[in-house]
Design a protein with these regions (language model features):
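Short alpha-helical segments that sit at the start of domains
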Residues: 1-16, 71-72
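Amphipathic alpha-helical dimerization/coiled-coil segments
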Residues: 75-120
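Minor-groove-contacting beta-hairpin "wing" of winged helix-turn-helix DNA-binding domains
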Residues: 61-68
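Short helix-coil-helix linker/hinge
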Residues: 6-9, 22, 86
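Short helix-to-turn junction characteristic of helix-turn-helix DNA-binding domains
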Residues: 17-21
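A short, conserved structural fragment
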Residues: 51-61
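Short acidic, hydrophobic short linear motifs in intrinsically disordered regions
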Residues: 23-32
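Short, hydrophobic-biased segments on the C-terminal half of alpha helices
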Residues: 44-48
Length: 123
C-alpha cells in the first residue's frame, strides 16, 4: 500500500493528533497553538490537506488518524533506505551504528527481531 507523504511540519502535527485522538479540531487548534506556535488557520489548513491525502478523517469536527504512527515511521524509513542507501538495509545499519552506540539491551532486542524474522515471523 502506498502511504501519503507526510511533510515535517505535518508530522509534528500528527504527533499531537496521535497522542490525543480522537480529538476535536478545536482542541487541535489549542494544542498546536501551545506546542507548535501555530495560528488557528494553519491548523485548519493542515487538517484539510491531510484529510484530502487520506492521513486523517475529520468527521463533524472530530479528527482521527487513518495512518498510524508506526505506518508513517515505517514508510519514512523505507524511503530513507531506498533513497540514501540504494535499498540496502545492511548499509543503513552500518551507517547508523558507526556513529550511534547501542546498549546491550538494544543489541539483545535487535537480535530477538532477527531471530523472529529468521523463523518466519514479523518484527
Amino acid at each position: 500500500m502506498d502511504f501519503p507523504k507526510i511533510h515535517e511540519s505535518e508530522y509534528r502535527f500528527c504527533l499531537i493528533m496521535w497522542e490525543y485522538e480522537p480529538v476535536t479540531a478545536a482542541q487541535l487548534v489549542k494544542l498546536c497553538q501551545d506546542q507548535l506556535g501555530w495560528k488557528r488557520t494553519t491548523t485548519y489548513t493542515v487538517i484539510k490537506r491531510l484529510g484530502e491525502r487520506g492521513v486523517l478523517k475529520n468527521d463533524n469536527g472530530t479528527v482521527t488518524s487513518l495512518v498510524s504512527k508506526d505506518e508513517a515511521q515505517a514508510c519514512e524509513i523505507d524511503e530513507l533506505v531506498e533513497k540514501k542507501f540504494e535499498g540496502s538495509l545492511p548499509a543503513f545499519i552500518a551507517a547508523f551504528t558507526k556513529h550511534q552506540a547501542m546498549s546491550e539491551d538494544e543489541l539483545d532486542e535487535v537480535q530477538r527481531m532477527i531471530d523472529r524474522i529468521r523463523k518466519g515471523g514479523s518484527q
